[in-house]
Each structure stands twice: as structure tokens, then as C-alpha cells.
A protein has these predicted regions:
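N-terminal export and membrane-targeting signals
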Residues: 1-7
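Bacterial N-terminal signal peptides
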Residues: 7-17
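C-terminal region of N-terminal signal peptides and the immediate post-cleavage residues
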Residues: 16-24
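C-terminal active-site subregion of NodB/CE4 polysaccharide deacetylases
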Residues: 23-94, 99-107, 184-319
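Alpha-helical scaffolding within the catalytic cores
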Residues: 24-26, 77-83, 121-127, 149-167, ...
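Short, well-structured secondary-structure segments
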Residues: 36-39, 69-75, 92, 118-155, ...
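Aromatic- and glycine-enriched glycan-recognition loops and surfaces
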Residues: 52-66, 71, 111-124, 152-159
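Alpha-helical scaffold elements lining the catalytic groove of polysaccharide deacetylases
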Residues: 112, 151-171, 177-205, 225
Length: 319
């Protein structure tokens, strides 16, 4: 039985979160608040329904930084292990479809270098310039898709890219073999799509196991269990979370209503992204804010009844 400790916590200050003189907001901890899981597709020109320009992607990161958001790994969120400085908030970046602008190499003499205008290049440069922001992200790849979505559209470099992502702390997720809408297919096809996608990635990154799947077009199979775990052609798969294509901000992993098999996301188009940034600006009490201590879960007064199963040693009620 967890101990619920009532205490008074002082408001915390984000002293290190300063960008060009802009001070991040000072927020009291609330680890039952909601979390934005952002969904990107193409990073390219021009801006369109499923395309974010490199300039707008940089602007997105800046707006998040200025508001005290910091990137966290999706699996850390799932495990309830969000370790951030007090007063900051987690944001989760996801990229669907392994399109070229997400991760591109350029040849420089005899070497290959990451294109500074691609998603990975932009994110890593921003993280270097803003210590503490991080570069955590999950890439939902399509190993068997046709060009240009066949593992970022540089066939000879596909293995190098996947190995780089895995070695640098990024996560690789299942998006089926070639973007199959799973509701349309029988069990055998669903399982083959999910297992074979993992097998293809393991050709380049031996032993790599997907922990999450993002459903193409948010299309669930006829039976939920088919997407959770199974086997095909000798390859087993097991997903701890299923990500939807839309739905808004996600619950805290510590909340009773946390459902990892139905995780909503926010599509990053101006309308949706602006809405949620503004929503949490106006309703800061609904936003997940870290207490700075990964061994505790701090919640607002009167909300301990909304806490679900937590792995932390203590739940602290802020008065």
C-alpha cells in the first residue's frame, strides 16, 4: 500500500529555463496533469496538411522550450519514470511514416553527415543550443513501404540510420510493414504486418524490439489483442502501448484513466498545435508539471483519488 503524504510545497522556479531573455513560466508541481504526445509526418517544404516546414519545426521547438517543456522518451512516460527538473513539463515527439525529411544524410567528401535541415538535424542542433531540452523522439517506420517512405528513402543508408537512432537514445516504433489499415485485414495479415516490420528492423539492428505501435490512420484491428502481441513467421512481437492518430492530450501515466492501449496524440498542424499550447497556457493546472523527484508523485490537493497504480515510493498531496 502506498503512503499518501500531505504536505505543503512551495512554488518552484525554472531558473535555468531561459531563452533569449524569455523566462519560462513558474508552475507548481502536478503529476496528474496531461501530457502532449506530438505527431509529425513530413519535414519538408511547403507547409501542408501532413507536412511541417523545417522553419516551423524549429519554431515549434522554441515555443515548447519557452513554455518549460522538455522532451522525454515515450517509454519513460509509459513506465511512469519521468525524470525532469522541478517545474518543467514533459513533451513527447513522434514521427510517422519514415519520410525523407525526417532523417537525411548528405555526402561530404568521403563522409556522410546528417542534413541540418532534416528533422533529426534540427532537433539535435536545438538540443545542443538549449541544454536540458533533450532530443528524445520515437520514429514509426515503414520498412516495406515504397519510396519515398522506405526507411527514409536512402536505401543504402537505411541500416546506418536505424543503427544511429537506436544508439543515440531515439526509439523506433512499429507502424506496420507498409502502412496497412489494420481494420481492413484478417488476423493473419495483421500479425504478419506487425511481426514482419520488426523482423525487417532487426536485420539492421539485431535484437531490437518494438515496445509501441502507432496505428496507420488510427485503424484498430477487429480484435485489440492482435495489435498487442503475437507471432508470424517465427517472429514474436509485444507492444506495451498503442498510439492513435488524434485525440488531444494524453493522461498522466499516474492517473486512473491512463490507458496505454488507446493513447491519443496531437497532430502538429498550426490549428491543433496552437490550440493545445494556448489551452495549457490558459489552464496550467491541467498540465503535467514535474516535482523534480522521480521517487514521488506530487498531485494537487483533493486529487489523490484520481491516482492509479504508481511505481513511486510516495504520493504527495500539494495543499
Amino acid at each position: 500500500m502506498r503512503a499518501i503524504v500531505a504536505t505543503v510545497l512551495l512554488a518552484v522556479c525554472l531558473g535555468a529555463a531561459v531563452l533569449a531573455g524569455a523566462q519560462a513560466p513558474t508552475l507548481a508541481p502536478n503529476e496528474l496533469g496531461r501530457v502532449m504526445i506530438l505527431e509529425y509526418h513530413k519535414i519538408d517544404n511547403p507547409e501542408a496538411r501532413w507536412t511541417r516546414t523545417p522553419e516551423n519545426f524549429k519554431r515549434d521547438l522554441t515555443r515548447l522550450w519557452e513554455r518549460g517543456y522538455r522532451t522525454v522518451a515515450l517509454t519513460d512516460y509509459l513506465d511512469g519514470k519521468i525524470s525532469l527538473p522541478a517545474g518543467t513539463s514533459p513533451v513527447i515527439l513522434t514521427f510517422d511514416d519514415s519520410s525523407p525529411g525526417q532523417f537525411r544524410y548528405l555526402q561530404k567528401g568521403a563522409d556522410w553527415v546528417i542534413d541540418p535541415a532534416c528533422g533529426v538535424g534540427i532537433l539535435e542542433a536545438f538540443a545542443r543550443e538549449h541544454p536540458g531540452f533533450g532530443h528524445a523522439a520515437t520514429f514509426y517506420v515503414l520498412p516495406g513501404a515504397k519510396a519515398p517512405n522506405d526507411l527514409f528513402n536512402q536505401a543504402d543508408l537505411a541500416g546506418r540510420k536505424l543503427q544511429y537512432l537506436a544508439s543515440q537514445g531515439y526509439e523506433i516504433g512499429n507502424h506496420t510493414l507498409w502502412h496497412a489499415e489494420l481494420a481492413r485485414y484478417p488476423e493473419a495479415t495483421v500479425r504478419d504486418q506487425l511481426a514482419t516490420a520488426q523482423a525487417w528492423v532487426q536485420r539492421h539492428v539485431p535484437g531490437y524490439r518494438f515496445r509501441t505501435v502507432a496505428l496507420p490512420h488510427g485503424s484498430y484491428p477487429k480484435e485489440l489483442g492482435w495489435a498487442v502481441s503475437g507471432e508470424a513467421k517465427g517472429m514474436t512481437y509485444k507492444h506495451d502501448a498503442i498510439l492513435m492518430v488524434a485525440g488531444g492530450a494524453a493522461p498522466s501515466p499516474h492517473a486512473k484513466n491512463f490507458d496505454p492501449l488507446h493513447l491519443p496524440r496531437i497532430q502538429v498542424v498550426d490549428k491543433d498545435f496552437d490550440y493545445w499550447l494556448t489551452y495549457f497556457d490558459r489552464n496550467p493546472g491541467e498540465r503535467y508539471v514535474s516535482d523534480g523527484d522521480p521517487t514521488t508523485v506530487t498531485v494537487a490537493s483533493g486529487t489523490t483519488g484520481k491516482v492509479g497504480a504508481v511505481k513511486a515510493a510516495r504520493v504527495i498531496e500539494r495543499r
